[in-house]
Amino acid sequence: MLSLPYLMRPSLHLPTMTEDLSNIHLSKAEFQEYGYRLVDWLAEYFDNVDQYQVLPSIEPGDIRNMLPVSAPERAETMDEIIDDLDRVVMPGVAHWQHPGWYAFFPSGASPVSALGEFVAAGLATQGMMWSTAPAATEIENTVLDWLVDLLGLPSSWRLDEGPGGGVIQMSASDSTHLSLAVARHQFELSGADANSLVAYGSSQAHSSIEKGARIAGFKHIRSVPVTQTFGIDTDAFVRIVRDDIDSGLIPAWVCSAVGTTNTTAMDPIRAIAAIASENGMWHHADAAYAGSAMICPEFRELQDGVELVDSYTFNPHKWLLTNFDCSVFWVADRSKLIETLSILPPYLRNETEGNPAAIDYRDWHVPLGRRFRALKLWFVLRSYGAENLRTFIRSHVAWAEALESRIINDSRLELAAPRTLALVCFRHTDGNDATRELADAINASGSAYVTPSVTDDVAYIRVSIGSTWTEQRHVEDLWDLIDSNAGLK
């Protein structure tokens, strides 16, 4: 507790009771004026993003050198601040929304999502509990129940129908970390030695598995070999699990990738589920990218057996027209998640405790505070409708299939992995150096950006089609760029 002398120390300046603070804020008229200007600015950006070079031509430190060393003592005008969007910010923007962005996986966005984010920022609710944010809480659990149905997931994951439930996290990495923490807690409750727990993922699994396992206190992390199509080799998985058991260790957690980052390879969920069940393991499914495609029924066979997993994550902020951050995490039994994370100090007690209709999302993730992330997702699902979202996904897959066909029929090129959904991985038949040279030529064009990668010492180029503003003509332009540089003159 603070001592009385500390509390009585004089301040350099204390506002008087008559001091008016309203003049330090934007007035209603000013807010409207600058709000309209910024909407116009963003609208122009959306309409002309293809006119920019995909990646900026700057060096590390260039943007910082344009900024003052210290924060301003006196207020600057909004005119000055908005002008600096063009002068300072835009020269250093990597244009993830460019139609020629084919690198990594897409970073979803849309005008509707931006408007939802704008409203959420203005409302500035703190959604830690139902009592502090009833609308934010109930819109979130309703929208996530909608998604259970839209993606063909088990109805028992709906908050209103079963023991499961969903929550929006910052990223799939956070979801993976949580699943590991819950698994560890369940084993500790049973009396298991936490130092003996083992986590498993394929050699192609996302790096967040290793990071999450470290944070969750797992001492043993296994990388399971994959088959020729880059999915987990279940025979190898069984052998590794048996070896660990023979060594006195406890198999505790395994991840099935519903689309690996490198090649969108699919792990055999149903077969992995059988091994996990036999050994009492927590089974997590990471569908960060591919999960959005499950809105199209024809792609759901890619995650056959999903009803058997204990937790599942996907990112609307990748391929469902919703801007970062928005990652959905479902658990088959929400009581295990809440039991792991619930801490109730006196200052968080409230009159709705124990009411099943009053969800306190503070018990569903690590932070206490949380943003109104569901609002932009609610805007997107309502504004586009499932029909248009399916058209969006199917178009990208069709364009990827057409690009794949051109690669197959070009003797200079070859596929580096089977195509799944809208990611095409290919290489130059002259080998690794030629492949890297081709990737460099594409990226140097300024009109397209692809990701070079390597698996088992084989270099290849990833083309991920999924940007909000990409159209068929842009993919055809990319092919022309590949074709004109594949000769490697």
Model region roles, listed by residue range:
Residues 455-489:
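PLP-dependent enzyme catalytic core of the Aspartate aminotransferase-like
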Residues 414-442:
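Conserved PLP-binding catalytic core of the aspartate aminotransferase-like
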Residues 174-336:
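Conserved PLP-enzyme active-site core in the AAT-like
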Residues 15-163, 444, 448, 459, ...:
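N-terminal entrance/gating region of PLP-dependent enzymes' catalytic architecture
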Residues 147-181, 222-225:
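Short loop-beta-helix segment that forms the pyridoxal 5′-phosphate
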Residues 161-163, 417-422, 454-460:
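Short Gly/Ser/Thr- and Asp/Glu-enriched loop/turn motifs at secondary-structure junctions
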